[in-house]
Amino acid sequence: MKIISNTAFGGERPLFELHDLRMENVVIRAGESAIKECSNIEAVDCRFEGNYPFWHVHGFVIDRCFFDVGGRSALWYSDHLKMTDTRIDAPKMFREMHDIEIENVEINDANEVFWRCKNLNIKNLKLHGGTYPFMFSSDRSEEHTSELQS
């Protein structure tokens, strides 16, 4: 597995179609589709500021990361995600995905999250505000999920 650490990327698709990659302390700046059409990706202690960073990604781990407001619509059309200890300030996360594990995650703009998702295993998720979470989703297992008004 290739390791990229302590750097930043911006612009359009800087990590397009990469496989078997671990990112440590990486910042994804403004731009679109930074990590598109990838597989076997790990992001640890990373920050996502640009739109659509994880689209069409198959098999990935996101641990101790932060999704800034600009990182909207970050996780779409992907599968086999394990996300832990992460804070999300961006809206419209998790769309048309399956096989998702979430643990110790806080979503501060829960507008339109988890739409058309299948096979979700959720532990300790906090949703703040937003409308229509889990629209058209199925096969959901939850432990300690709270929806808080902002």
Model features per residue range: what roles?
Residues 1-48:
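N-terminal segments that cap or nucleate solenoid repeat domains
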Residues 2-4, 21-24, 41-43, 60-64, ...:
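All-beta strand scaffolds that present successive hydrophobic residues in beta-strands
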Residues 7, 84-86, 131, 145:
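Residue-identity detector for threonine
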Residues 11-16, 30-36, 50-58, 70-77, ...:
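Short glycine/acidic-rich loop motifs that flank beta-strands on beta-rich extracellular proteins
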Residues 143-149:
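Conserved small/polar residues in nucleotide/adenosyl-binding loops
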